A protein has these predicted regions:
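Glycoside hydrolase catalytic-domain context in secreted enzymes
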Residues: 1-187
Length: 188
């Protein structure tokens, strides 16, 4: 099946859903739709430096340490390893009907936030403060996770896109007002 056929098939499937069924698929813990033969799927998995949680996997250095090497090829290679391990875990677990959190093929990785404020407790997840390096390593990791073939090995979901450097405890209500210059210079 090529991309055009896959898109057509997906559109036909969604057309068979009612509004509530379609809306439920937008949550990270999408329920099964038995009448359409769609199994449940949990979109929440992480692979910031290897596949996180749900069993054993290779753990690589944190992204900030990988960035210190300035090696796009190695970062892509680590993404390839993570997606291979993630796919193997997914295949084994889904055959047993285990589709819980941290067991899917959608990885909330990489973290492409530009690390500007050292008070943010998650800076180690990023590629640092340089927008160019963050861009290049983020793209390399995504290429590694998703693969270069006709079909995706896994789905990368870049997170914490812009102006997300904390403080972490207040992230859901902290009201930041960066200047247009700062946004253009460092974030987009």
């Amino acid at each position: 099946m090529n991309r055009a056929e896959a898109k057509q098939k997906a559109q036909a499937l969604v057309a068979q859903m009612d509004v509530l069924e379609a809306a439920a698929q937008l949550s990270y813990d999408a329920p099964a739709l038995d009448r359409l033969h769609i199994p449940e799927y949990n979109w929440w998995n992480e692979a910031l430096h290897g596949v996180a949680r749900a069993g054993v996997a290779t753990s690589f250095p944190q992204a900030i340490a990988m960035a210190a090497a300035f090696d796009q090829d190695e970062v892509q290679h680590l993404g390839e390893i993570a997606s291979t391990e993630g796919r193997a875990k997914y295949n084994a677990l889904s055959q047993k009907g285990d589709r819980d959190i941290y067991k899917g093929l959608t990885f909330w990785s990489p973290n492409i936030n530009v690390f500007r404020d050292p008070r943010w407790g998650r800076g180690h997840e990023t590629y640092g403060e340089d927008p160019y390096l963050t861009t290049q390593l983020g793209l390399a990791y995504i290429r590694g996770l998703q693969g270069q073939g006709e079909y995706l090995k896994a789905a990368a979901c870049a997170k914490h896109f812009a102006v997300h450097s904390g403080p972490e405890a207040e992230r859901h209500h902290f009201d930041v007002h960066p200047s247009k210059k700062e946004i253009g210079r460092a974030h987009v």
